[in-house]
A protein has these predicted regions:
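Hydrophobic/aromatic packing residues within the alpha-helices of TPR/SEL1-like helical repeat arrays
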Residues: 451, 458-459, 493, 529, ...
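Helix-start (N-cap) detector for alpha-helical repeat units in TPR-like alpha-solenoids
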Residues: 412, 469-471, 503-507, 540-541, ...
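Non-ligating segments of multi-cofactor redox enzymes
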Residues: 2-276, 291, 296-440, 450-453
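Membrane-interface segments at or immediately adjacent to transmembrane helices
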Residues: 407-498, 524
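Register position in tetratricopeptide repeats
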Residues: 482, 518, 552-553, 586-587, ...
Length: 648
């Protein structure tokens, strides 16, 4: 009787295309647990191996090799095609820079509108990392389980709107009246600084590890795509309009092999039964489901889009969270994202999204672990009968370390943010502050308060931080100078310059050289300004300052040569023209002095502070006659009651 029931169950299962756990365990099916044999072309689960998997792996490997070749070509030739990265579109929308990333992103969206999300499945380096991680985990017997949330799936779309739509909206409502809504487009298809918009290698490595591996381990395959990728936000939206879908024929017997194989966490068998096609925008057209179908019932074809599919609630989706947990999870995600984004001026936007998704999972899982009597993760039993096992303690320790680091980043970011807010509220112009050694004596009460608060916040972030914020250091140095501590400011700027590169380093060196000149350390100032010009030869302000240092050292011919070079590069430089006029007058070249004086006057704004700054700088160089002229003009323009600093 038992044998009859067994084979009846087997026959019914074959008819329906499904095999029960009892039959699998009994070894009645080839390749299943408990016995049997493995048929060629089939995995141990009895599901046919995907033939497209290798083709897709080859495509993704080729993509990564192409990216490496792109970087090598740039290193060898010094210039190359701008990064083929969708994030470059931001610079097109904000500044009108037409680059390769913008063109690629536009074509990818158009392709998705027609064919669906093939670009995601076959042409994304982050997805390649996620698939590689999933493959490694399966090799050691760990099968990533999808983390399913109702609310967090909207994060990619929100991130996409923030990256690509918000800048346009902001430009429309905040642009000056003379600026067009759409910026003038310029050609930036070729670049000499390929890595300018990317994080450093030291940041890129943990970024790829978190977004390509950690997210898969905790959130399941395509975890980053599902809960963090902003480009996927637009691709998923475009997929709803696409006529290209995975579709089904009447040969389907609902075996479920397609769903079991899908690495995009799509309920393929249920959707094709209900709609005749896959409607989930998470489908990345990997084609594994088509390849493994034992009846060849699935295919890619064109027809009606998701928007035209009938509405239905038949398919019941099982989520990982209750609604209260969803709300808490959304708040945790937002808090974590704000805590880590930009902390230490290191963590980029996409990395912050990946970190926030993992933090959300760990927070909610830890909360459940503390409350539940039974809980497992992968094949590890974390807790049973209300008692934590060794694996549970390991999970709790890791989760607490991760969440604790996240909270620490939030504390540092809080001080960095408030420091930046205070810094941006200081209204004293740099030119006025550098006109004399001690600007602190004539700061407004509001400026003084903001400077003190900004310095306190930057120092608090520095004292408690694990890394140095190279962008905050120059700001701290400037606040120190404004408070009258020029010596400390010079030291801080030196520290900043030693840690910076390119334009940032050049600016720190420029300000350091300018402050050294105010301290009377002209030889050090000249050397520092030479370093700045070595980083950025086009930094005209550094040339002006270098000329002043040379003049103070008695090397007047060299000073005149430097100022002349600056004016030749930019004829509208008011200070350099006035310095040349004063120098030529002292050297007896009155005709040349008159030419430069007129040229300087042509571009001098009718602002009393501007004339006062010119007078002060010229007075320090011993060009008293020209200085007095500007002091008088400043006095005339300030007759309305504007209070100017003293001349001494």
């Amino acid at each position: 009787m038992a044998h009859v029931l067994f084979w009846r169950k087997f026959a019914n299962s074959v008819k329906s295309g499904c095999v029960s756990r009892d039959l699998k365990a009994a070894g009645a099916i080839p390749g299943q647990a408990g016995g049997g044999i493995n048929l060629p072309g089939y995995s141990r689960t009895g599901i046919r191996k995907s033939k497209t998997g290798r083709w897709r792996a080859a495509a993704l490997i080729a993509l990564n090799l192409f990216m490496i070749a792109h970087i090598i070509q740039w290193q060898i030739m010094g210039k190359t095609v701008s990064p083929i990265e969708p994030s470059e579109t931001m610079y097109t929308l904000q500044n009108g820079f037409v680059n390769a990333g913008f063109i690629f992103f536009g074509l990818a969206i158009l392709a998705t509108l027609l064919f669906g999300r093939f670009v995601c499945g076959w042409g994304c380096h982050i997805l390649a990392l996620q698939d590689f991680c999933g493959w490694l985990l399966k090799k050691i017997g760990l099968h990533p389980k999808p983390f399913r949330s109702r609310l967090l799936v909207y994060v990619p779309l929100c991130a996409a709107l923030y990256m690509f739509v918000w800048p346009v909206v902001y430009r429309i409502f905040s642009k000056p009246g003379h600026e067009p809504i759409i910026p003038k487009f310029t050609n930036h298809l070729v670049t000499t600084n390929f890595w300018a918009t990317f994080p450093s290698v030291a940041v890129a490595i943990p970024f790829l590890f978190i977004c390509g591996f950690v997210t898969v381990y905790f959130l399941g395959q395509k975890g980053f795509c599902t809960y963090a990728c902003p480009y996927g936000g637009f691709f998923g939206l475009a997929d709803k309009f696409s006529p290209g879908k995975i579709r089904v024929t009447p040969a389907c017997n609902q075996c479920g092999h397609c769903t079991a194989t899908c690495t995009s966490n799509v309920l393929v068998h249920a959707e094709v039964k209900q709609y005749g096609m896959v409607v989930d925008p998470g489908c990345m057209k990997c084609m594994d489901c088509v390849s493994v179908c034992p009846n060849d019932a699935l295919y890619f074809g064109f027809g009606k889009s998701t928007l035209l599919a009938p509405k239905s609630n038949v398919i019941k989706r099982h989520y990982s969270l209750t609604w209260p947990e969803e709300i808490v999870g959304a708040l945790v995600f937002l808090g974590s994202f704000l805590a880590v984004r930009g902390v230490y001026a290191l963590v980029p936007f996409l990395m912050a999204l990946g970190c926030a998704a993992v933090t959300t999972f760990l927070t909610l899982k830890t909360w459940r672990l503390l409350r539940a009597r039974e809980l497992s993760f992968y094949r590890f039993n974390l807790k049973s009968s209300g008692k934590l096992h060794k694996a549970g303690w390991v999970f709790v320790i890791f989760a607490c370390a991760w969440i604790g680091l996240n909270m620490h980043c939030g504390w540092v970011r809080y001080h960095e943010f408030l420091g930046n807010v205070a810094f941006n509220k200081v209204h004293l112009p740099d030119e006025v502050a550098l006109a004399q050694l001690d600007p602190a004596r004539w700061l407004s009460p509001a400026d003084r308060q903001n400077i003190i608060q900004g310095k306190e916040h930057y120092l608090a972030a520095s004292r408690t931080g694990l890394f140095v914020n190279n962008e905050a250091l120059p700001k701290l140095a400037w606040l120190e100078y404004l408070l009258g501590d020029a010596e400390q400011s010079v030291q801080t700027l030196g520290t900043a310059a030693a840690r910076q590169k390119d334009e940032s380093k050049a600016l720190s060196l420029y300000y350091r050289g300018a402050i050294l000149s105010r301290l009377g350390r002209y030889d050090e100032a000249r050397a520092t300004l030479d370093e700045a010009l070595a980083e950025r030869d086009d930094l005209i302000l550094a040339r002006q300052e270098k000329g002043e240092a040379l003049w103070q050292l008695g090397r007047r011919d060299e000073a005149v040569s430097v100022w002349t070079d600056a004016v030749q590069r930019n004829a509208s430089l008011v200070l350099a023209n006035n310095e040349l006029a004063g120098a030529q007058r002292l050297l007896g070249n009155l005709e040349q002095a008159s030419v430069h004086e007129k040229q300087g006057d042509q571009f001098t704004p009718n602002n009393p502070f501007y004339h006062w700054v010119l007078g002060r700088r010229l007075q320090d160089l011993g060009m008293t006659e020209l200085a007095e002229k500007h002091f008088q003009q400043a006095g005339q323009l300030s007759s309305s009651g504007t209070e100017l600093p003293g001349q001494n």
